[in-house]
């Protein structure tokens, strides 16, 4: 059992419960947990859990040495800064999609989710911390709109995940956060174990983007199918 996941579980129990299905390579159990835990009255609770995860993301961003942000980020050919920026954009975009659907404002012409959009290249520590903070503020506003509408359908379409309900997208954003938090902990561990200029992230990769050919068996397939990447294609 992963130490970092155990540490965050008290503050984000629903997200961690769903994420553990990914660890076990059980895609169906992840969908089941998301559905079970994102029902009526869940939005406020899930927003708080997204806040706890955002704090954990900020903590690891603040702990990484500056050169790490240009190192391989464990996601295709992205660097660490791009992966973090992508996650910040994704959590905000998924929450916003649920809020738009909950309030009847989801634009009919909105594009589907576009997987594999990296964050802005070249951002440093302070900019990434600000980006994560801004994403959490969007999540909190979206959560207030989703509250009471958790079980309403959302037109957002993901090529691997399909469609989820408004409250389910909010929880899925937290699960997606944990995927990238896992990568960051792997990168931090690589830095600790390879003093003097190792390549953090090169030894801890979750595989190719959805549709890629990176090997990895059933667990890898679950990880790929569950990547709720939502950059560039989010409704506005």
Features from the language model and the residues they span:
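Short, contiguous, helix-prone interaction/anchoring segments in small proteins
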Residues: 33-69
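A short, mixed-charge helix-start or loop-turn motif at secondary-structure junctions
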Residues: 36-43, 118-122, 159-166
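Short, contiguous alpha-helical
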Residues: 1-35, 70-113, 151-196, 236
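Long, intrinsically disordered low-complexity tandem-repeat segments
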Residues: 195-220, 225-233
């Amino acid at each position: 059992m992963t130490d970092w996941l155990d540490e965050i579980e008290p503050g984000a129990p629903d997200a961690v419960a769903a994420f553990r299905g990914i660890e076990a390579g059980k895609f169906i159990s992840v969908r089941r947990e998301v559905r079970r835990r994102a029902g009526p009255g869940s939005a406020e609770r899930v927003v708080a859990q997204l806040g706890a995860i955002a704090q954990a993301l900020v903590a690891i961003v603040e702990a990484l040495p500056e050169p790490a942000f240009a190192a391989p980020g464990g996601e295709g050919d992205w660097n660490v800064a791009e992966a973090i920026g992508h996650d910040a954009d994704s959590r905000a975009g998924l929450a916003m999609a649920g809020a738009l659907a909950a309030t009847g404002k989801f634009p009919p012409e909105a594009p589907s989710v576009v997987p594999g959009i990296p964050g802005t290249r070249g951002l440093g520590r302070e900019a990434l911390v600000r980006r994560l903070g801004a994403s959490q503020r969007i999540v909190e506003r979206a959560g207030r709109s989703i509250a009471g509408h958790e079980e309403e359908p959302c037109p957002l379409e993901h090529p691997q995940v399909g469609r989820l309900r408004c409250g389910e997208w909010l929880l899925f954003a937290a699960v997606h956060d944990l995927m990238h938090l896992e990568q960051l902990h792997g990168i931090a561990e690589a830095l600790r174990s390879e003093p003097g200029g190792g390549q953090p992230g090169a030894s801890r990769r979750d595989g190719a983007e959805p549709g890629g050919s990176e090997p990895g068996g059933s667990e890898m397939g679950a990880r790929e199918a569950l990547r709720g990447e939502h950059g560039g294609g989010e409704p506005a």
